[in-house]
Amino acid sequence: MILKLNFCLSTYSVLILLSLSTQAFAANQAKTKVVPSSTISTKSLKNGISEQVEGSANIPGRLADIEVNGSGYPTDDEDGDDVHGSGKPPSSATTKSDKVTSPSHAVVTAKPTTVPTTTASFKPPVQPKPKPAANDKEIKVEEDEDDDEDEDEDDEDDEEDFADENIHNDEDFFTTTTTTTYRPIVVATTSTPRSAATNPPRQQPPMVTSTISSGPFSPFHETLANGFYAAIAGGVLVAVITAILLVLFVVFRIRKKDEGSYALDEPKQARPYASYGYTKASTKEFYA
């Protein structure tokens, strides 16, 4: 009997453990069903960020594979629209070409203005040094009547020399004009237009909060999705195990009762020691 009780208890404990493990597994399955929505939202955010190229100022709808080829015109190009050094802004044709994005091949040309710089240098006139006299002692001051005439002639000679020096010094003034010309850069943009249908706006799926819906199982749909189904399955399993154990216990008690009972139809046997006992005669009276 003790062995049977131990077997029943061990079976009951094993069944309870199985029910608990089944309930935990069902709850984990219900949680994992909610995770893919968050992963889809994170992937969509990453794809949306990867379409933008930092620092490129490109429209997100365009492709990021842009080929840039640089070429330049010589400084003596026959382009009469821009005047070097005039500060004239670029023509409207070039600004309009920057905004063209519809064709598959767009060529953008930029013609910056040239900045002229002028530098002037001055060379001071070289003054002739007076030659020293051969002998200072031989210098004599002579006064003559023609000193005034000589002074006038000297003044005229000085003026002529000064004029000649000015004529020669004009050559010393020279103007250096440095013109810095920036070569225009031709940007060849090759892009393939993409249809709007291939890039649908990615939005996070809306979270359904209302429990009212159509269908045969509409009242229970939201509760089953949140793990309520796992609790129901675990409760049903525990109830079935309890019913089985109760039936086993009832059968065990019935069998135990059958072992201690006897059939009423069987005749009673006389005890072996009854012949040695005192028996009263049925026809005689007994007197003490």
UniProtKB/Swiss-Prot annotation:
Residues 141-164 have a biased composition (Acidic residues). InterPro entries: Syndecan, Syndecan/Neurexin_dom, Syndecan_CS. It is a single-pass type I membrane protein. Residues 27-231 are extracellular. Keywords: Cell junction, Cytoplasm, Glycoprotein, Heparan sulfate, Membrane, Proteoglycan, Signal, Transmembrane, Transmembrane helix. Changing residue 214 to A: Reduced heperan sulfate binding. The cytoplasmic domain is required for correct mitotic spindle orientation and internalization of sdn-1. The chain crosses the membrane at residues 232-252. This is Probable syndecan.
